[in-house]
Structures are given as structure tokens and as C-alpha cells.
Amino acid sequence: MDARGGGGRPGDSPGTTPAPGPPPPPPPPAPPQPQPPPAPPPNPTTPSHPESADEPGPRARLCSRDSACTPGAAKGGANGECGRGEPQCSPEGPARGPKVSFSCRGAASGPSAAEEAGSEEAGPAGEPRGSQASFLQRQFGALLQPGVNKFSLRMFGSQKAVEREQERVKSAGAWIIHPYSDFRFYWDFTMLLFMVGNLIIIPVGITFFKDETTAPWIVFNVVSDTFFLMDLVLNFRTGIVIEDNTEIILDPEKIKKKYLRTWFVVDFVSSIPVDYIFLIVEKGIDSEVYKTARALRIVRFTKILSLLRLLRLSRLIRYIHQWEEIFHMTYDLASAVMRICNLISMMLLLCHWDGCLQFLVPMLQDFPSDCWVSINNMVNHSWSELYSFALFKAMSHMLCIGYGRQAPESMTDIWLTMLSMIVGATCYAMFIGHATALIQSLDSSRRQYQEKYKQVEQYMSFHKLPADFRQKIHDYYEHRYQGKMFDEDSILGELNGPLREEIVNFNCRKLVASMPLFANADPNFVTAMLTKLKFEVFQPGDYIIREGTIGKKMYFIQHGVVSVLTKGNKEMKLSDGSYFGEICLLTRGRRTASVRADTYCRLYSLSVDNFNEVLEEYPMMRRAFETVAIDRLDRIGKKNSILLHKVQHDLSSGVFNNQENAIIQEIVKYDREMVQQAELGQRVGLFPPPPPPQVTSAIATLQQAVAMSFCPQVARPLVGPLALGSPRLVRRAPPGPLPPAASPGPPAASPPAAPSSPRAPRTSPYGVPGSPATRVGPALPARRLSRASRPLSASQPSLPHGVPAPSPAASARPASSSTPRLGPAPTARTAAPSPDRRDSASPGAASGLDPLDSARSRLSSNL
């Protein structure tokens, strides 16, 4: 567009501000221009006649003086026109014509979106947004605010709280430093280095060196004093932490008032450049007068007062705690190391100061004849030798082990010696106290156990207990607490629910791994049970429960062997992974047997209220407990009508599906196997060796047992890496007639054949009470069972998916049979019968064997 065209928009006069248009692209770099006011006055070089909004004139197409034009726009035109006679600028953005490469943006147009997002407000000098200076200013401003890290999250609670604290710093004013900011952290660390240097170097320089005009000494003093003066200024802009209510003061006025009332005087006195004043005064006085200025070097000790800033040291300790959390150090170890290091460092620092003081006082007195320096003729010795003897003298006094090379003779040395002894005794007492507290805090549980056992010993002495009782009590405490005592209930009670469950599951992991009841159950059921267990220890010969008493607990065996005793002299062994005492909890009755500990037993007990509370939420597990209880009662020659009625009701109503019934039968089968192991003499000690790898997985055990129960082709237990694939071998037998029994084997292992019956669709996994349990399986003597194969072998076949045969009359059942009253139904096989298969009815009915022999023969016939 040229000057003759009406390219300008209505109302775009220099004296008016048009409405903002679409944001233009960022212009090329241009010299910084001052930001114009919203309504600039008319240009004095152009006529200020108004133009109509409907008649845009040529002045509407002129660039404003305040606009930023590109170099191409400055090639031609007058009064701010763009080159080539075509205005290429617009107050609202770039021209919409074809010539868009030459553009200038008017001052009336607002900043672009990129500038608003990437820059702050322009400075008073007209600095454009997005410049390098603004970027550095933003980065440095972020250093003054608390960052989002582990330390700040622990201090403020959440990321949102940290962001609110950052907004507080921004709104508090310019150059306000947060005490937890990164800048303050690095600054405090730098000041710590200067503190250590001044605490060590300044006393040595004042005491043992005469010439203070050397270049290293001047550089050290200049740098130190400069940093302390800067620290004095920064303290007026640093927030103050109120330890009582954890409030952080960020108001500049409050910071100034509080700093003036506390540490300002000490910091100001310590920051005065005394050395520079001495150097200036030295040129205006003669040398004789300057000799007396040596005594004025004591003024340098005012800097020591400024370096003992306890608040800064405490702030450093808080940051060290942050480092400990980052590097995953334990709090006890970190605090112990910090306390010991601080105490040792303070004692060494006091020894250093005392050593310098031992030489400084005689030096200020021009080394009198009775001082230790003159007596030893060490006035003209080197500073290292003088410092070594002075430090030895000071440490001898502080540790109260002597006076050094000779006893003090002058009054000054006597007072210095007494001062050293007082300081040393104080440090020694502090060290003993800290060391004692450290030792007690590192092993508080053992200390608590020792204190408790001392009370037990006094109790035994007071009641004059015999020696055997005292030994039993001692053994109990050793096995129960193992040298450490703590309130576990209180510790777990203070934790939240998820964390408490994780800890309980971890503590009881061995119990869960050894119990198929837990390993194959719902994880929620396992967690609910474990959170209610109580740990107990019993010694050999202790009767855990007695027959005929009211049961209030059941027990789970983690380690140990127990014997189940009845009045009929029938005994049954239980070991790791078993449980007992659940029968009376299920029936609300009395104990049906006594349980005695054969070894040291580590058990977990469960009260009756907690037991019923958990089982109300998991009915299948109640059914599993009831089924195992019926099987155990049958093995010791007893029965419970209440449990039988409950199980029959569940079977008839079809509450549980086939999968749940199979799991229940696996639990029953594994319980029988564990009893057989204990009866065969394989007793487990208090701390048994770890089982073979193929037995450690309870899930693999269940899968292998199920596969072997339903697959007659598997002639031996599945052991090895292929064990986990065994569920694919599980097959259901189609309904059909029961295959005929195989040819009989040896008479000792061949039970009498049970009457067969036609098969029908199965409705329950149990036979009717009183019916004989018929089993079909290969014969395997019990002595051939190895330790590795017993837990994985299918000693009791799982129930097939068919209906048990109708039960015969009660009179047809042998009276002396030890077969369980609730046994699995006849098992159907899909493969052809092998010659070595035989019916597995209990031989005890025909041969009149002892109950233990009957159980063993029943085990071999079932296998």
C-alpha cells in the first residue's frame, strides 16, 4: 500500500490508542526503547488535526516515534514512514499485505505472548522483556526461595505448602532470602569454612607471629572481613525461624528489629577491619610507640565472639540432616556421629585456644623471668616449637594429668593453670555424659531387657525360688526375647494401617510360607489373621492346652514339635506349619485333647473373639477349619455332631463350588501329610534347616498335589522346574461306570474291596456320614517316602467331580474301622486300570491293627 491508498484503519491516529489486534510475531532484536504511556501525546512535528474514523488519512499510516521498526523500515519515508513509500507497520500487528518481511510494531500494541510468558516487567531503563538480564534475575530469585526437595517437603508437609511458602517470599519484598533456600545453604556452608579458618588461624597469628604486614596475612584478613561484612548485610534480609512455633518471619521490619536485639552487636564488632586501622596508624607514629600496639592485638579476639554463632551452627546441623536423608543414612547413626564429632571438635578447639593463651599472656608481659618460656630458654625458638610446648602444657592441665614440664611458679601461670583445669574438667564431664547417652541410645532395647531381667532376678531371690525354676525362667526369657525387649504392641499401634499390615506380613513370612492354609488362602484373609496374632514361646514339657478345659485360643506353630494327647492314649504329632486348638473355638465347647510341647516351640496364638470375627467375613475358610477338625477328631477316634451337621448342611446346600471344595480337600490332605511326617520320626527342631527348593513354594505344592490327585498317569511327584506347569495336567473324569479293581498285591498292603456303585453327576465332595471311603491308588510303602517327596506327594487323593456311592447300612460298616467318617468318594480314572491298583479300604477293620499301624497302612494303601 502507498500513501494514496486508504490502507490505514479508522481511528489509527498518533494521538489515539487503537484496540489491540492479534498478537504479532516477535520482532528482530532492536535497540531498547522506553515503554510509552498508554495514551501518548500527539507528535509535535505533525499537525494535530483530528481525523474522522470513517476517513483515514495518511498520518494513520505513519509509524509512531515510539514504535520499533526493522532496519528495512528505516530505509525511506518521512516522519516515521516505512521505506519504499509503503507503511509496513501497524499499531495492531504486522501488515496484512504481501510485503510482510519489513514490519514495525507500534508502541500502542501490547507485548506478544512469548514475551509475556518468558519475561518479567521491563526495568526503569526500558529494558525489553525476555532479555538475558531478566533471565538471570529470575534464576537468582529462585535461589532465594525454598526448593521442592525432601527436606522442604518434610518441613512444610506437601509440595503445595512449599509453593505457598515460595509465594510468601515473593510477596515479602525484593531480595528477601528464605532460611531454607539453596542460596542460604551454600552461603552458610561458605561461612562455616571461614569460621573454622578464623578460629584456628587468628589465635596463632596473634600469638606467635610479630609481622602482620605480609601478603598472605593481609589477603586472609581482607577476604575474611569482606565476607563477614557481607554476612552482616545479608542477615538483615534473611528470614528468621522461630523454633517455638516453627514460624518463619519474612517481614523486613520484623527481621531488622529481631536481628538488632540479638546478634547484631557481636557481628558488627567482629566485622571491624582492625588490621587495616593498625596499618594506617602505623604510618603516622614512630616505631617506639608502635611497639605498644602489639598489646592491642588482643582486640583480634573479638572476631572469635562473632564466630561462635550457635544459631548458624544449629542451622548447619539441620542441613546435615537433609544430607543424611538424601544418602539414606539412619537417623540414629547420623545423630550419634554428629554429636561425637561436634564434641571432639569443640574439645580440640578449646585445647588450641588454651595453648595459644599459655604463650600469649607471657608474651604480653615481655616474658618475665619466672614464666615457663624464660625458664626453658625458649624465647627465641621457632613458632612451631613454642606452639607444641604450649599445647602440651594446656592439654596436661585440661586432662588433669600434670603440669607439663614443670609446675607453675608465677602467679600468672598459677591462674592460667586453674583456668585450664576448670575448662578441662567441664569438657571431660560433657564428653562422659554424651558418650553415655550415645551408648544407651544405640542399644536401648538391650538395656531395657537387662533392666527387666534384673527385676526378674530380684523377684526370684525375694521368693526364694529353687534353682530349677530359676533356670527355666532364664531359658524362657532367652528364647522369648533373645536379649532385646520392646513394646511391640505400642510400636505397631502408632503406625497407620497399611504400614502395620506390611510389617506384620514381613514378620510372619516364615509362618505363612510353611502353612498351606495361609499360602493358598485369600491374601485379605491372611492379613486379617496375621494382624490379630500374638507371639508366644513354650518350653519342652509345657502343656499348651489341657483336655476338658474351656478353649479361648488356637495356636499356629512357627517352629517346634507338639504332641496331641487324649485319654485313650492316642497320640498325634504336629510340627512347623500346623495349627491346633481350633475345634473348641468352632463349637464353643471344651478341649477335646491335650497338647504338650516336645521341643522349644515358637507359636502364634489367636483368641476366640478374633477367630470368629475373621471367619465371619470368610465362610470358605471356616469350612476349611471345620473339615480339618472333623478329620482330626476321626483320627483320634472322636466325633462332634455340631461340626458334622454344619458340614452336611453346606454339602447339601451347595454353598461352595468345585474349586473351593478342591482347595479345602488339599488343605485337609496336607494336614494329614504333616501328621504322618511327625509320626514317622521326622521331627523339626526349633530352627530347622531350610527346605529344598521344590518345597519352598506352597503354590507349587498345591498345583502338584492337585495334578497327581486327578492324573493317574503321573507315577511320581512333580519335582523341578516343570512343577509350576502341572495345573495343565488336571483333568476331570467323565461320568461312567467305575472300572474294576486291579489284581491284588501283597496281602499286607491289600485292603478288602469296597462295594462299587454306578456313578452319577456329583453334588458334593463328601460322602454321607457312615459310608465307607473307597480309594484307588498305587501301593507305596511308607518307608519309601523321602523327605523331599512327602510334602509334594498326593497321600490323600482329591475328590473327583462325581457323586459318591450310596452309603450302605450302618451295620455293614466295620466297627473297628479307622477310616475317616467323612472321606472322599470313589475316584474315577480315565486311563486303563494298572495291575498294581487295588481298593484302599482301611485294613484295620479286618486285621484288628493298632490305630497307629492302621493309619500307616491306610497311608500306604492310599498312595
Swiss-Prot record:
Phenotype upon loss of function: Hcn2-/- mice exhibit decreased body weight, behavioral/neurological abnormalities and tremors or absence seizures. Hcn2-null mice also displayed cardiac sinus dysrhythmia, a reduction of the sinoatrial hyperpolarization-activated cation current and a shift of the maximum diastolic potential to hyperpolarized values. Mice in which Hcn2 is specifically deleted in nociceptors expressing SCN10A/Na(V)1.8 have normal pain thresholds, but inflammation do not cause hyperalgesia to heat stimuli. After a nerve lesion, these mice show no neuropathic pain in response to thermal or mechanical stimuli.
Description of how activity is regulated: Activated by cAMP, and at 10-100 times higher concentrations, also by cGMP. cAMP binding causes a conformation change that leads to the assembly of an active tetramer and channel opening. In the absence of cAMP, the C-terminal region is thought to exert a tonic inhibition on the pore when HCN2 is in a non-tetrameric form. Channel activity is modulated by intracellular chloride ions and pH; acidic pH shifts the activation to more negative voltages.
Post-translational modification: S-palmitoylated.
Effect seen on changing N380Q: Abolishes cell membrane localization
Effect of R300Q: Shifts voltage dependence of activation to more negative values
Segments for region (Involved in subunit assembly): 131-182
Record's keyword terms, sorted: Ammonia transport, cAMP, cAMP-binding, Cell membrane, Glycoprotein, Ion channel, Ion transport, Ligand-gated ion channel, Lipoprotein, Membrane, Methylation, Nucleotide-binding, Palmitate, Phosphoprotein, Potassium, Potassium channel, Potassium transport, Sodium, Sodium channel, Sodium transport, Transmembrane, Transmembrane helix, Transport, Voltage-gated channel
CDD domains: CAP_ED (cd00038)
Any one GO CC term of the record: plasma membrane
Localisation: Cell membrane
Residue numbers spanned by region Disordered: 1-131, 730-863
Keyword rRNA-binding: no
Residue positions binding 3',5'-cyclic AMP: G581, E582, C584, R591, T592, R632
Biased composition (Low complexity): 106-128, 756-765, 778-800, 808-834
Tissues with expression: Highly expressed in brain. Detected at low levels in heart, in ventricle, atrium and in sinoatrial node (SAN).
Biased composition (Pro residues): 17-47, 734-755
Cytoplasmic side: 1-188, 235-261, 312-342, 435-863
Residue positions where Phosphoserine is found in the record: S119, S134, S641, S726, S743, S750, S757, S840, S842, S847
Family annotation (PANTHER family): I[[H]] CHANNEL, ISOFORM E, POTASSIUM_SODIUM HYPERPOLARIZATION-ACTIVATED CYCLIC NUCLEOTIDE-GATED CHANNEL 2
Entry's free-text remark on domains: The segment S4 is the voltage-sensor and is characterized by a series of positively charged amino acids at every third position. The ion-conducting pore region is between segment S5 and S6. The cytosolic C-terminal domain contains the cyclic nucleotide-binding domain (CNBD), which mediates modulation by cyclic nucleotides.
Known partners and oligomeric status: Homotetramer. The channel is composed of a homo- or heterotetrameric complex of pore-forming subunits. Heterotetramer with HCN1. Forms an obligate 4:4 complex with accessory subunit PEX5L; regulates HCN2 cell-surface expression and cyclic nucleotide dependence. Interacts with KCNE2.
Name under which the protein is recorded: Potassium/sodium hyperpolarization-activated cyclic nucleotide-gated channel 2
